[in-house]
Amino acid sequence: MSQVILDLQLACEDHSGLPEESQFQTWLNAVIPQFQEESEVTIRLVDEAESHDLNLTYRGKDKPTNVLSFPFEAPPGMEMPLLGDLIICRQVVEQEAKEQDKPLEAHWAHMVVHGSLHLLGYDHIEDDEAEEMEALETEIMLALGYEDPYISEKD
């Protein structure tokens, strides 16, 4: 199994308590090589202001969000291993984990898994797409040793 090349960017002001780069690498490697041989992904950890600006600009949502996925589209005739960028907002991830009573590490892992599946073309707009994507997320999270991230929503 091939390994994903990770470019980790720490753009948030406070770096304390963030997952280690090796954890991000593990989470990416649990998802992407199943679908794509050679890949490079940028994960950018940001504060609420940058997340808010990007979410407003690209999704029309006037608030910060947990993870944004920007798939890379190579010009025609050019093959590159760049899969895309994940922008993850530290404060939103931490707040959601607290509100949902989930272990913080597990929620970070889920955001990387969720965002990676978006980079690979998965979506959750339609119900059937959401079911497929959530099933994959659950399978990957369980394989990583975490609980089903949707368990409280299914009860």
Curated annotation (Swiss-Prot):
Keyword terms of this UniProt record: Cytoplasm, Endonuclease, Hydrolase, Metal-binding, Nuclease, Ribosome biogenesis, rRNA processing, Zinc
Localization of this protein: Cytoplasm
The protein's required cofactors: Zn(2+)
Per the record, GO CC terms? Answer: cytoplasm
Which EC number(s) does the record attach to this protein? 3.1.-.-
Q: Name one GO molecular function term.
A: RNA endonuclease activity
Similarity comment: family membership: Belongs to the endoribonuclease YbeY family.
Name listed for the protein in its UniProt record: Endoribonuclease YbeY
- Please give the organism: Citrobacter koseri (strain ATCC BAA-895 / CDC 4225-83 / SGSC4696)
Q: What is the lineage of its organism?
A: Bacteria, Pseudomonadati, Pseudomonadota, Gammaproteobacteria, Enterobacterales
As recorded in Swiss-Prot or TrEMBL, the protein's gene is named ybeY
